[in-house]
């Protein structure tokens, strides 16, 4: 039984048995205080709440149930006056014992200064909004309204994702199903890094998974209630690598999200929660597009008075017509400034989890060899490289395609595709080795550039090796089965098993 995936056979496989001799520690957290801790990837913290109520980003921890955390920067908040008691001990994580240069020791402290009261007040305001919308829609089926559409913005390391996760968790506790929209391609939210997702949240997050999100149906069965994200492929981990493609994918994701809200009354009443990459007033065009595409009516600014004032000036016409409200909340004192090494390691673990599952819900990834000639493969265009090439043109010149290269009806569409994707005419190890490839929903006999731009993602595959001699590629899939002969899009996200 222990060898069967899903029955806990691999739960402790990455634990160094010698480390189990470590004595457990007890932490007493006072009411409205939080215990902040950082666990390196080389260490596994095993903790449980033995008394009271404790929650991580709004997700309540089960009483007397041990959970395992690694590579996290979390805080356990005690919402009740009685506080809570936590027991924990640490063991070595054999899977990451040599993969990082970080220390094995955790860092932890208790803080009585927390921004959770502000975040809870924001939640109560949103819930009051949802309640009024629900009552209106119940008696007015012909003129229904939509719940709060919340956009969270702020600088880097301001706690945007933590706030969105907290608001989504609190919404679930009130039996709501808000759509969580992730527009930060750096993070893999129910998908791999480089993707933009929209996911209805109707169940608690899986705190033991990478970044505390949980699994989805895109890679297999899950321990928790599976999330079903709508995934748009962007292909880069920075929104600035191809702004045209980023804005286009945001617009199409917005169309799909608005359509979903019109079809599902529970989602319509619950509204949206939108997480974003670090944005400043210089990125106003992006913010303006998001507000328009997702019909945002509330913008939450975290800890940046200047950004709040500048945005109010830019959106004064919407404020005057009561189409948009602004809310400023303080930045949490527990926000950690993560370095690039931690971000990359977190991305690698996210990709690894996508294909291999978690310790509680392991997957059986499927390896196969495919003939590259049987597939049509595109690659996302890095606009920074394109701009570098155009810089060699003489001053005042610009590149335009030859008129003979395309028909009149297709000129505009075909040339517009070059801004976003380029077809790999000769796939090779130099452009496919150790890369993540998006499997689109578009059959490869479809030659429409517009359909390619509008398609969503079925899932992702990992090309571990490309044989230039045989023109074959070794591919890893998250579950057994034949790879559909759909158009593939190679991303800039690399991964080595």
Curated annotation (Swiss-Prot):
Q: Where in the cell is it found?
A: Nucleus
Q: Subunit comment for this entry?
A: Component of a pre-mRNA cleavage factor complex. Interacts directly with PCF11.
Its name, as the record gives it, is: mRNA cleavage and polyadenylation factor CLP1
Described function: Required for endonucleolytic cleavage during polyadenylation-dependent pre-mRNA 3'-end formation.
Q: Which residues bind ATP?
A: 34, 73, 157-162
- What is a single molecular function from GO for this protein? ATP binding
The GO cellular component terms are: mRNA cleavage factor complex
Q: Which UniProt keywords apply?
A: ATP-binding, mRNA processing, Nucleotide-binding, Nucleus
Q: Name one GO biological process term.
A: tRNA splicing, via endonucleolytic cleavage and ligation
Question: Major location, coarse class?
Answer: nucleus
One Pfam family assigned to this protein is: CLP1_N
Organism per entry: Debaryomyces hansenii (strain ATCC 36239 / CBS 767 / BCRC 21394 / JCM 1990 / NBRC 0083 / IGC 2968) (Yeast)
Q: What is the lineage of its organism?
A: Eukaryota, Fungi, Dikarya, Ascomycota, Saccharomycotina
Q: Which family does it belong to?
A: Belongs to the Clp1 family. Clp1 subfamily.
């Amino acid at each position: 039984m222990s060898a069967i995936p899903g029955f806990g056979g691999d739960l402790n496989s990455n634990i160094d048995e010698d480390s189990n001799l470590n004595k457990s520690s007890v932490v007493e957290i006072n009411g409205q205080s939080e215990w902040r801790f950082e666990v390196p990837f080389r260490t596994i913290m095993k903790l449980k709440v033995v008394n009271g109520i404790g929650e991580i980003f709004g997700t309540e921890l089960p009483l007397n149930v041990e959970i395992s955390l690694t590579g996290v920067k979390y805080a356990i908040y005690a919402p009740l006056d009685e506080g809570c008691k936590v027991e924990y001990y640490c063991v070595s994580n054999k899977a990451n014992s040599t993969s990082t240069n970080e220390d094995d020791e955790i860092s932890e402290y208790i803080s009585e200064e927390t921004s959770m009261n502000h975040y809870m007040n924001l939640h109560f305001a949103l819930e009051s909004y949802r309640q009024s919308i629900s009552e209106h829609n119940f008696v007015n089926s012909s003129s229904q309204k939509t719940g709060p559409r919340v956009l969270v913005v702020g600088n880097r390391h301001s706690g945007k994702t933590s706030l969105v996760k907290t608001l989504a968790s609190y919404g679930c506790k009130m039996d709501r199903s808000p759509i969580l929209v992730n527009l930060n391609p750096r993070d893999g939210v129910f998908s791999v890094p480089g993707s933009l997702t929209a996911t209805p949240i109707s169940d608690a997050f899986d705190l033991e998974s990478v970044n505390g999100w949980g699994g989805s149906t895109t890679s297999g069965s899950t321990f928790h209630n599976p999330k079903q994200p709508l995934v748009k492929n962007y292909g880069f981990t920075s929104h600035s690598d191809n702004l045209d493609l980023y804005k286009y994918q945001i617009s199409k994701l917005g169309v799909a999200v608005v359509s979903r809200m019109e079809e599902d009354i529970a989602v319509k009443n619950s509204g949206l929660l939108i997480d974003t990459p670090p944005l400043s007033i210089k990125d106003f065009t992006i913010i303006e597009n998001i507000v328009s595409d997702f019909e945002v009516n509330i913008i939450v600014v975290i800890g940046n008075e200047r950004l709040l004032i500048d945005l109010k000036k830019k959106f004064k016409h919407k404020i005057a017509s009561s189409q948009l409200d602004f809310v400023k909340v303080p930045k949490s004192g527990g926000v950690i400034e993560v370095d690039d090494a931690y971000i990359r390691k977190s991305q690698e673990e996210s990709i690894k989890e996508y294909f291999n599952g978690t310790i509680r819900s392991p997957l059986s990834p499927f390896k196969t060899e495919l003939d590259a000639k049987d597939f049509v493969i595109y690659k996302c265009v890095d606009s920074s490289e394109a701009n570098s090439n155009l810089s060699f043109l003489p001053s005042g010149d610009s590149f335009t395609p030859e008129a003979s290269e395309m028909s009149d009806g297709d000129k505009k569409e075909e040339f517009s595709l070059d801004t976003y994707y380029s077809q790999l005419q000769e796939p090779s190890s130099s452009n496919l080795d150790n890369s993540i490839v998006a499997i689109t929903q578009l059959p490869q006999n479809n030659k429409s550039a517009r359909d390619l731009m509008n398609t969503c993602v079925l899932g992702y595959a990992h090309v571990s090796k490309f044989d230039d001699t045989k023109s074959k590629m070794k591919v890893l899939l998250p579950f057994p089965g034949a790879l559909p002969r759909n158009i593939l899009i190679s991303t800039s996200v690399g991964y080595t098993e």
